[in-house]
Swiss-Prot record:
Function, as annotated: Protein S19 forms a complex with S13 that binds strongly to the 16S ribosomal RNA.
Coiled-coil stretches noted in the UniProt entry, renumbered to this chain: none
Protein name listed in UniProt: Small ribosomal subunit protein uS19
One GO MF term attached to the UniProt entry: rRNA binding
Keywords for this protein: Ribonucleoprotein, Ribosomal protein, RNA-binding, rRNA-binding
Source organism per UniProt: Oleidesulfovibrio alaskensis (strain ATCC BAA-1058 / DSM 17464 / G20)
UniProt record similarity statement: Belongs to the universal ribosomal protein uS19 family.
Transmembrane segments: none
Pfam families, sorted: Ribosomal_S19 (PF00203)
Protein origin, superkingdom: Bacteria
Record-linked PANTHER family: RIBOSOMAL PROTEIN S19P FAMILY MEMBER, SMALL RIBOSOMAL SUBUNIT PROTEIN US19M
InterPro entries per the UniProt record, alphabetical: Ribosomal_uS19, Ribosomal_uS19_bac-type, Ribosomal_uS19_CS, Ribosomal_uS19_SF
Any one biological process term the GO annotation gives: ribosomal small subunit assembly
UniProt keyword Cell wall biogenesis/degradation present: no
Amino acid sequence: MPRSLKKGPFIDDHVMKKVEKAQESGDRRVIKTWSRRSTISPEMVGLTFAVHNGRKFIPVFVTENMVGHKLGEFSPTRTYYGHAADKKSKAKR
C-alpha cells in the first residue's frame, strides 16, 4: 500500500542534510548511508550514495528514473549464485 499523498515522501533528516550540503558546496563525493528506507527525491539526481546492504556499501548513482523509489531497491541484500546443476546428469558422464 503506497504512502498517503498528504504526508509526502519519507526521507531521513540526516540524509537530506547531507544532500543539501552537497548541493550547496557542489561536492560530488559519495554519500554513505544506512538509510535504505529513504525515498529518492529530485534533489538527489546526479549524486552517488553508498547504500548499506547488510554487509558492505553498494555505490548507487541516482538518475531521473529512480525518483520516487527507495534507496534500498538499488542495493540487493541477497546473493544469487544461480540454480544448482543437476547432480544426476553429472554422475552419468
